[in-house]
């Protein structure tokens, strides 16, 4: 039986989030609605999650000493990584020592912190279908890994840093002239300085989806796996622009997608939500990536599901029942900063909300960049295409000024 103490009391149930952006903010809100005391951690002040948590902390989460000192001082019941750039070896050590429970597990946080760990697990350990790939530690290695005459992945292909966020550093290559530029772009977009990339042969897929996969306790107290309806999405430069739910799939493709998602998440273990990214070509499904946390494309669930992805995550990690039922078809569209400024102002909010059956989420980020995600428009409709048009219309009516 799950018990939850009163926040700010000696018996409080305390949860620490490592990473307090827009996704972490929504997880914090979901936890607070269940009476949990929250600690929001990020590398900069006034992050979105800092603005609503009981406690806000600023550290370098890649610094093992700072991370250990904070966790030992705060003594949370659960530590929930919300980003990849964390000293995961420290989390593994603290979990082994019995200091704290990491969500979903410290091993999962380590394996998914970079594209090499999770790709090797999926393709080489679990034998799941993926695009052809190689890992490279220099420009020369990258050129050799692509060269089709030497058994490389050939063109077109995609180059990504081993660790990056929101598509940073990713590029598609159509020929040899693109290689050096792609290497430099990957190095600039990487969150760490290990100078390694993954190059993937291009999969000529029909569409790509995120399959939100939830591991939560069932009625018998054992962990069960359940799935949300498939989420379709469109990306630009590796970054999500819009998403919609449900995305139509054949029964065969859906079964394959669920099999792949179940295989990966069961191996990673623990409880919580996982965003499993998949490419689909006909009935063939290819594994791409997995995040052991809510997914940016899953923000659409804030308008489509009875329990959105953040509520599902909060419930699952606390040992509470979950419900992945779809409430309505819907869509999300990103609101970009469009300006380089701090303390921006949002205009046109009233105009945006006049679009039928729409909602807005403005993230409260303290600084805007041209392509920074500052908010999201949500729309529901029985027809997905109508929802997509309305979400895009609402997002376009919001203006950001410095």
Swiss-Prot record:
A cellular component term, taken from the record's GO annotations: cytosol
EC id: 6.3.1.21
Residues that bind N(1)-(5-phospho-beta-D-ribosyl)glycinamide: 22-23, 82, 296, 365, 372-373
Residues annotated as domain ATP-grasp: 120-318
Pathway: Purine metabolism; IMP biosynthesis via de novo pathway; N(2)-formyl-N(1)-(5-phospho-D-ribosyl)glycinamide from N(1)-(5-phospho-D-ribosyl)glycinamide (formate route): step 1/1
Positions bound to Mg(2+): 277, 289
GO molecular function, one term: phosphoribosylglycinamide formyltransferase activity
Reaction catalysis annotation: N(1)-(5-phospho-beta-D-ribosyl)glycinamide + formate + ATP = N(2)-formyl-N(1)-(5-phospho-beta-D-ribosyl)glycinamide + ADP + phosphate + H(+)
Principal EC category: ligase
Record's keyword terms, sorted: ATP-binding, Ligase, Magnesium, Metal-binding, Nucleotide-binding, Purine biosynthesis
Positions bound to ATP: 115, 160, 165-170, 200-203, 208
Family per record: Belongs to the PurK/PurT family.
Protein name: Formate-dependent phosphoribosylglycinamide formyltransferase
Organism name: Mycobacteroides abscessus (strain ATCC 19977 / DSM 44196 / CCUG 20993 / CIP 104536 / JCM 13569 / NCTC 13031 / TMC 1543 / L948) (Mycobacterium abscessus)
Taxonomy of the source species: Bacteria, Bacillati, Actinomycetota, Actinomycetes, Mycobacteriales
Gene: purT
């Amino acid at each position: 039986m799950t018990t939850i103490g009163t926040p700010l009391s000696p018996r409080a149930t305390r949860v620490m989030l490592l990473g307090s952006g827009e996704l972490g903010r929504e997880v914090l809100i979901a936890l607070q609605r269940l009476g949990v005391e929250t600690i929001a951690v990020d590398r900069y002040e006034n992050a979105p999650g800092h603005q609503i948590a009981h406690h806000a902390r600023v550290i370098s989460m890649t610094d093992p000493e700072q991370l250990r000192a904070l966790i030992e001082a705060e003594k949370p019941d659960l530590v929930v990584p919300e980003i990849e750039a964390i000293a995961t070896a420290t989390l593994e050590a603290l979990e082994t020592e019995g200091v704290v429970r990491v969500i979903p597990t410290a091993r999962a946080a380590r394996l998914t912190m970079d594209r090499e760990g999770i790709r090797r697990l999926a393709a080489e350990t679990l034998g799941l279908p993926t695009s052809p790939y190689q890992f490279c530690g220099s420009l020369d290695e990258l050129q050799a890994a692509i060269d089709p005459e030497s058994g490389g992945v050939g063109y077109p292909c995609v180059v990504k840093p081993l660790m990056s966020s929101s598509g940073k550093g990713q590029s598609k290559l159509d020929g040899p002239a693109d290689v050096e530029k792609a290497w430099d772009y990957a190095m600039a977009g990487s969150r760490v300085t290990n100078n390694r990339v993954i190059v993937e042969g291009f999969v000529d897929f029909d569409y790509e989806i995120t399959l939100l996969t939830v591991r939560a306790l069932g009625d018998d107290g054992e962990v069960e796996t359940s799935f949300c309806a498939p989420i379709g999405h469109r990306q630009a430069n590796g970054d999500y622009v819009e998403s919609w739910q449900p995305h139509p799939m054949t029964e065969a493709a859906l079964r394959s997608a669920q099999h792949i998602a179940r295989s990966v998440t069961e191996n990673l273990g623990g409880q919580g939500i996982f965003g499993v990214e998949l490419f689909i070509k006909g009935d063939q499904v290819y594994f791409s990536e997995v995040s052991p946390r809510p997914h940016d494309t899953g923000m659409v669930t804030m308008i489509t599901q009875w329990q959105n992805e953040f509520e599902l995550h909060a419930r699952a990690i606390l040992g509470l029942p979950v419900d992945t039922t779809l409430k309505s078809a819907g869509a999300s569209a990103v609101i970009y900063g469009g300006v380089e400024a701090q303390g921006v102002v949002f205009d046109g909010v009233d105009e945006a909300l006049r679009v039928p059956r729409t909602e807005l989420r403005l993230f409260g980020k303290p600084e805007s960049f041209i392509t920074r995600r500052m908010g999201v428009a949500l729309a529901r409709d029985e027809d997905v295409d109508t929802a997509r048009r309305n979400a895009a219309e609402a997002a376009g009516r919001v203006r950001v000024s410095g």
